[in-house]
């Protein structure tokens, strides 16, 4: 290994660091050919694949954004419809509660009126029976008084 390094140093001293002979242009031409071949065989296809992939990503993102926008619009629409349905349901519930309260108050008023009428009828009947009982009692009192009077007058004679 040391030998090869020494040979390289001797060769460099003998010919110099850069010899301006035909090797430099040949190396330059080889480099340019290599760049051209790599460009046509590797870089352009890779660039095309990368560009097509970027295009695919852009279109996919655009489609995804459109779908997201549509989904958001549908969500807003459905939320608005749900809000309307809730309002309608609340109105129906309020109307039903009002109708139930009205029916309850009507039935309560009717029941109170019926109870009041029955109570009044019972009072009248009680008053009538009281009057009848008082009249019968008065008749019995009169009859007993007449009998007592007769007995008193009959025994006094």
From Swiss-Prot:
Question: Cross-referenced Pfam families, in alphabetical order?
Answer: ATP-synt_B (PF00430)
Q: What one GO molecular function would you report for this record?
A: proton-transporting ATPase activity, rotational mechanism
**Mostly located where?**
membrane
Compartments reported by the entry? Cellular thylakoid membrane
Aminoacyl-tRNA synthetase among keywords = no
Sorted UniProt keywords? ATP synthesis, CF(0), Hydrogen ion transport, Ion transport, Membrane, Thylakoid, Transmembrane, Transmembrane helix, Transport
Which regions span the lipid bilayer? 22-42
Q: How does it sit in the membrane?
A: Single-pass membrane protein
One annotated Gene Ontology cellular component of this protein? plasma membrane-derived thylakoid membrane
The UniProt family comment states: Belongs to the ATPase B chain family.
Outline what the protein does: F(1)F(0) ATP synthase produces ATP from ADP in the presence of a proton or sodium gradient. F-type ATPases consist of two structural domains, F(1) containing the extramembraneous catalytic core and F(0) containing the membrane proton channel, linked together by a central stalk and a peripheral stalk. During catalysis, ATP synthesis in the catalytic domain of F(1) is coupled via a rotary mechanism of the central stalk subunits to proton translocation. Component of the F(0) channel, it forms part of the peripheral stalk, linking F(1) to F(0). The b'-subunit is a diverged and duplicated form of b found in plants and photosynthetic bacteria.
**Assembly with partners or alone:** F-type ATPases have 2 components, F(1) - the catalytic core - and F(0) - the membrane proton channel. F(1) has five subunits: alpha(3), beta(3), gamma(1), delta(1), epsilon(1). F(0) has four main subunits: a(1), b(1), b'(1) and c(10-14). The alpha and beta chains form an alternating ring which encloses part of the gamma chain. F(1) is attached to F(0) by a central stalk formed by the gamma and epsilon chains, while a peripheral stalk is formed by the delta, b and b' chains.
Instruction: Report the protein name in the record.
Output: ATP synthase subunit b'
